[in-house]
From Swiss-Prot:
The active site is at residue 148. This is 3-oxoacyl-[acyl-carrier-protein] reductase FabG. Catalyzes the NADPH-dependent reduction of beta-ketoacyl-ACP substrates to beta-hydroxyacyl-ACP products, the first reductive step in the elongation cycle of fatty acid biosynthesis. GO terms for molecular function: 3-oxoacyl-[acyl-carrier-protein] reductase (NADPH) activity; NAD binding; NADP binding. Homotetramer.
Length: 241
């Protein structure tokens, strides 16, 4: 059984559905969770659910100094889950430079800073687990998401590079790539749109945020000590790689 008692985990994007599920699961397994995001009210609501053994840290990931300080404020960090991300979808011929830059800055650059600062702390203890949340489209591509796909593909490459650099230091760096996961966004789709998507999924259903949380929990555990530089796809068979 996975036991994270005595460990501290930082989860970014914790105010969203997947981030909240990850925080709940790591908390359930005994970890002190530091829940971070830009929406303080949603973080407080999550904290009320957790009741204890949590800390709220509001952070604007577009500010590189705030990214660095977010990790610097933590005395001991065992687990980092980089889950925060944004989309600015449109066809490439209509995509503005700032739409591309904003997605790269938050989805890739901010996560690099968080990974780098976490590694500095983890190297001191010669132990750490880093899990970067990427996406199925970081491998498959998707029309109208050139910026988002580039950021998520970059996250996979970054994960592999960092895994090489710290493999002898007791630190693992892995990624989890969600497919279509039930969310507020998918709930707004009409029946025809939902059916079109589920037809592409061999399992025939959307995933749940808890499916991602379970994958993260395993990669955050000591049981995954011989796994690093990998991307765990959680997509119901929609993409088999």
């Amino acid at each position: 059984m996975i036991d994270l008692s005595g460990q501290t985990a930082l989860i970014t994007g914790a105010s969203g559905g997947i981030g909240g599920a990850i925080a709940r699961q790591l908390h359930k397994l005994g970890s002190h969770v530091i829940i971070s995001g830009s929406n303080e009210e949603k973080l407080k609501a999550l904290g009320n659910d957790l009741k204890d053994n949590y800390t709220i840290k509001v952070c604007n990931l577009t500010n590189t100094e705030e990214c660095s300080n977010l990790v610097a404020q933590i005395e001991k960090l065992d687990i980092l889950v980089c889950n925060a991300g944004i989309t600015k979808d449109t066809l490439a011929i209509r995509m503005k430079n700032e739409d591309f830059d904003q997605v790269i800055d938050i989805n890739l650059k901010a996560n690099f800073i968080l990974n780098r600062e976490a590694i500095k702390k983890m190297m001191t203890n010669r132990y750490g687990r880093i899990i970067n949340i990427t996406s199925i489209v970081g491998v498959s591509g998707n029309p109208g998401q050139a910026n988002y796909c580039a950021s998520k593909a970059g996250l996979i490459g970054m994960t592999k590079s960092l895994a090489y650099e710290v493999a002898t230091r007791g630190i693992t760096v892995n990624a989890v790539a969600p497919g279509f996961i039930k969310s507020d966004m998918t709930d707004k789709l009409n029946d025809e749109q939902k059916e079109a998507i589920t037809r592409k999924i061999p399992k025939g259903t959307y995933g749940m945020p808890e499916d991602i949380a379970n994958a993260v929990a395993f990669l955050a555990s000591k049981q995954s000590s011989y796994i690093t530089g990998q991307t765990l796809h959680v997509n119901g068979g929609m993409l088999m790689v």
